Amino acid sequence: MIRIRFGMDVLLVLLLATCLLSPAHGTPLEWDFAVTLRTKIQFMDSSWQTIATAAHEFDELSAITFDESEELIYFNDMRHQNGSIFSLKRDLVAANHVVEQRIARTGNESVGGLAYDPLTMNLFWSDIEQRKIFFAPIDGSAAPKVLVDLSAEGGRPDGVAVDVCRRKLYWTNSNVTHPTVERINLDGNNRTVIINSTIDMPRGIVVDQLSDRLFWIDDLKGVFFAIESSKLDGSDRLVVLKDKHHEPLNLAVTNDAIYWTDRTTRSVWSHPKVPVIRVTTTSKPVEEDSTDSTDFKDPEPVNEDCPLVRVANLSEEVRGIVVRTGFYQRLQKDHHCASIVRKVKERVDAQNTKFEVRSLQDQKMKILQDERCMNHGEYKPATDLCICPTGFKGSRCEIRECHNYCVHGTCQMSESAYPKCYCQPGFTGERCEVSVCAGLCLNGGHCRASKDEKEAPSCECPAKFGGARCEQNSTEICTLFCRLLKHEPEMYVPFGCHSICEELAQDNSTNIAVPQYQHLEVCLTPKVWTSSVIIILVIGIVSSLLLVAVIVHGIRRLYKPKRPRIRKTFVVRKQARTNSAGDTPLTNRPLATEQCEITIENCCNMNICETPCFDPKLVEQTLSKSSCKEDKKILIHNMEDDLY
């Protein structure tokens, strides 16, 4: 009886735990779409209502992929110092999402696309900077290896997608000079180019296992873009959509629609998968002489019932997108995928058996602990208390602190273990309960909240309303001015009321006066060449010319050649003459053997030319003489032949 009772108790506890842990409809696990914004991952349901957000600790998220077999999301952060690719596990009862580093950072990686193979548990990603495609196991047992190297040929791998059933990898080469869509076996063999014509810059790519087709984004020249499709071998190529003014990056495909992210509008858009234009379809022209119109076929008209639909407006730049497709449930009987799905399930079941409780005693203690302390709380028998994990409170850890805490925002537990709200754009307050536009704009004005939290919201006023809150009715104000002007012609009327007064005067000219502005043409077309402008212009030109003249003069003085050195040589020939009584040492010098040379240098510089040099003795002897002819003889330059 004791064993039977214990077994029944264990069974009841297990049933209770199963009921507590089984996800119900509308719980955070039941998400259908996930997108990567710049600083977080946002989860949405089938109606594109935000369920939760995660990965707030990252700064630059980009690519994302999803493993439906184990409910794991893999994403890339371009600014993380240690890791490059991470995994995120969402749990129904966990306060925070479990994030683990999967691929370490080795340099300045720039991940363009990310894909996952659940059979081999390998991640595949494209590196735009290194121009290579890598792969590595998620358990870190091996270093990343190169699957495709496009650096030598100048390729630029962007989007990547794995065909799990046929064991192939597809990627887009966004090199504008030679864009392609290619594929290769997952073992690195049999590389094939499947699309290389009529394509500009392919970006994101996805394999639709439900329809056995490829879908990719083509960023066309100018402002246009297209979403195209083909069979897995590149045949039967179709243009699903062609539009403009979008900057699409990545896409996801469901059973009946295509979804893509747009950086320009920060939105997610959708369009039916049914193609409307065939690339290879051409119409035969009608010849001028032909009378049979049966040979001419009009091109297929564009389906007007398939417009673009903006399904989500997001607060940040949106980049990657994944969708829950029910791949493993819907492809169990597919002849290409049945064996792969079976192998993946066997692997997942084998992993789950490792976490089963091995002993009955451990199982009993775990059941008692789960029965007393909920949400993984730690039970303390000595004090009969539950130590709750972060994010839960209550005597049994039964209250989730973030439950209904934020009115218009996402709740996350802060580092100090308190709930914190990340408000949606346009809301503020501790719990995001206050709208920044509440009662702000009057008279039908439209409030626009800035994306920058530091900027205040602004009002877009309708016609004939103004002011910071659209509180000023320009028609009523100008009507008062126009009526008063009828009685007080000298009153000032604002310039903006001129057109309103003219409209009112057409219906009621007896009580309305139109202001007459004497210098209206001056206000509308101001004269540029005024007297002050001309004076300033003339002074500037004259000053510029004077400055140029001073510079030229200084340069000429700086580079002016030096005055030449003047040398003059006097040659005195030897003459025989007798010594007279009046000879002195100055007049009767020793004679050279042949002749005597006298050199006078820089005569002009020494003012010799202006003041001639005289022989002192001869001057004394001839002081009494006044003849000019005699004075010339005593000059040095005239004494070459007369002194001896």
Swiss-Prot record:
It is found in: Cell membrane. Residues 398-430, 433-471 form the EGF-like domain. One of its GO terms (molecular function) is Wnt-protein binding. LDL-receptor class B repeats lie at residues 121-166, 167-211, 212-257. The keyword Signal applies. GO terms for cellular component: plasma membrane. Pfam families: Ldl_recept_b. Residues 553-644 are cytoplasmic. One of its GO terms (biological process) is spermatogenesis. Glycans are attached at residues 82, 108, 175, 190, 196, 313, 473, 508. The keyword Lipid biosynthesis does not apply. Residues 27-531 are extracellular. It is a single-pass type I membrane protein. Disulfide bonds join 402-411, 406-421, 437-447, 441-459, 461-470. Belongs to the cueball family. Has a role in spermatogenesis and oogenesis. This is Protein cueball. It comes from Drosophila erecta. The lineage of its organism: Eukaryota, Metazoa, Ecdysozoa, Arthropoda, Hexapoda.
